[in-house]
Every structure is written in C-alpha cells, then in structure tokens.
C-alpha cells in the first residue's frame, strides 16, 4: 500500500491518501490537546499507544458485528482504514455523569445514569462542538433520519460490548464519543478512533481517572494511565 499526500491534519491524527481510492492511512501523533485545541502538548508514546489501543478495540467491535473502518495496522503509529464520507456529528453515550453533562445540568459527578443517555454534538471546534438534536441534523443536511437511527443503534451496541469488556478489566466505561461515516457501498461505518482520548474510564474500586481527563485536569501520568488500561485489557503494545 503506497502512502501518498496528506489530506487532513487533525488535533492528534493525520490522514493520508493511498494508491487505493477506498483506503486511507491514519497516522496517530503524540500531540495531545484539550479545550477544543486551545492547549496542545507532546506526550511521548501517545501515538503508538492510541493506535494499538484503537486497533484492539475496533477488532473487538468487528467481532461483535459492528462495522468499523479499521483494516490493518501498518506500523506503531499508522493504520490502514476504509475511506469514509464522515458525518459531522459526534454521538455521545453516557453511563455515569461527568464532563459537560455535569456542567450543563449541575448533577453530581459519578452519578450512575439509569438508563444511559445518548446525545449528539456538532463536530465544529470553532463553535465549541455545540449540543444538537436529531431534527437539527436532518434540517441542516448533516445526515438523514435513517443514518441517525443506524448511528444510534450502533452506538448502543458499542456501549453494550465495551461496558462488559472494561468491566472485566476492573474499569468503568463512564462515557464515550463516536463518529460515523458512509462507505462507498452506502453503509454506515464506525470511523475515527476509540481510545482513552475519546472516552472516560475510571478504576472500578478507586474511581481513579484513567483517560484524557488526566491531561485536561492536570493530574499527570497521562500515558502511564493509558498504558495501564491497555495492559489490563491485554492490548499488545
């Protein structure tokens, strides 16, 4: 597979064309950002850890019948993926109250949500990724009602699969965000990544934060926490 020019450079990943029109290469960088890119630092090993963590999770999801863009690992920080037409909407599933939900509603951090909540946010850093609803998505042409229904169905299936996976590793899956795209055959496919950058994970017993909140909140030992999560799951680093 020939790696060609860079198509897009995000906050933590770069996207490259290949000689296959239906495939791209994602490069996971060591860049670590918070607050919509206003704070950026380099954390050694982060690109490698997130790339291998993501590959492990995506393969678990594929095995559970969830279509993902993952194809194969190419290097410590590179992965081959299906080319998707991304829908500019983040799907957020919450099992416990944390982050923006606590700020918006004034509820206690760590409160168990029964049932889980499912939320949508417009993927737009300049606007602060605003909270939206399904009618906004359809009205503004960001996606169709059918696509949204499939995105929700897949998001909840991901929650079911990964909640058990993390629970078995002594971790609480507090919340997570997912992004989806449309493949060349018209199907909705899980894209982007699943790593401690885009979810909240707490130790089941101590409630120690094991995710990017360690960076956001200045708790330190960010990569050490990521690696501990990976080791608990059996991710080969």
Curated annotation (Swiss-Prot):
Pathway: Purine metabolism; IMP biosynthesis via de novo pathway; 5-amino-1-(5-phospho-D-ribosyl)imidazole-4-carboxamide from 5-amino-1-(5-phospho-D-ribosyl)imidazole-4-carboxylate: step 1/2
Catalyzed reaction equations: 5-amino-1-(5-phospho-D-ribosyl)imidazole-4-carboxylate + L-aspartate + ATP = (2S)-2-[5-amino-1-(5-phospho-beta-D-ribosyl)imidazole-4-carboxamido]succinate + ADP + phosphate + 2 H(+)
Keywords: ATP-binding, Ligase, Nucleotide-binding, Purine biosynthesis
GO molecular function: ATP binding; phosphoribosylaminoimidazolesuccinocarboxamide synthase activity
EC number: 6.3.2.6
Cellular component terms (Gene Ontology): cytosol
Biological process, per Gene Ontology: 'de novo' IMP biosynthetic process; cobalamin biosynthetic process
Top-level taxonomic group: Bacteria
Record flagged with keyword Nucleus: no
Protein family (similarity comment): Belongs to the SAICAR synthetase family.
Name of the protein this chain belongs to: Phosphoribosylaminoimidazole-succinocarboxamide synthase
Organism, scientific name: Pseudomonas fluorescens (strain Pf0-1)
Gene name in the database record: purC
């Amino acid at each position: 597979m020939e790696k060609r020019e860079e198509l897009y450079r995000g906050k933590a990943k770069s996207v490259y064309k290949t000689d296959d029109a239906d495939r791209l290469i994602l490069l996971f960088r060591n860049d670590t950002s918070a607050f919509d890119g206003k704070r950026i630092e380099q954390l050694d090993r982060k690109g490698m850890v997130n790339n291998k963590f993501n590959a492990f999770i995506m393969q678990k999801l594929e095995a559970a019948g969830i279509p993902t863009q993952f194809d194969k690992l190419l290097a410590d920080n590179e992965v081959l993926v299906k080319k998707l037409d991304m829908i500019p909407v983040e799907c957020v599933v919450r099992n416990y109250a944390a982050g923006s939900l606590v700020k918006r509603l004034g509820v206690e951090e760590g409160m168990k949500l029964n049932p889980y909540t499912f939320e949508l946010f417009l993927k737009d850093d300049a606007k602060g990724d605003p909270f939206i609803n399904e009618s906004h998505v359809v009205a503004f042409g960001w996606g169709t009602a059918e696509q949204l229904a499939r995105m929700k169905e897949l998001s909840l299936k991901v929650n079911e699969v990964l909640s058990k996976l993390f629970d078995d590793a002594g971790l609480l899956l507090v919340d997570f965000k997912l992004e989806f795209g449309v493949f060349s055959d018209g199907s909705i496919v899980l894209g982007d990544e699943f790593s401690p950058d885009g979810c909240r994970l707490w130790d089941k017993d101590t409630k120690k934060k094991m995710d990017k909140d360690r960076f956001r909140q200045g708790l330190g030992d960010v990569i050490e926490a990521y690696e501990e999560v990976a080791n608990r799951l059996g991710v080969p680093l």
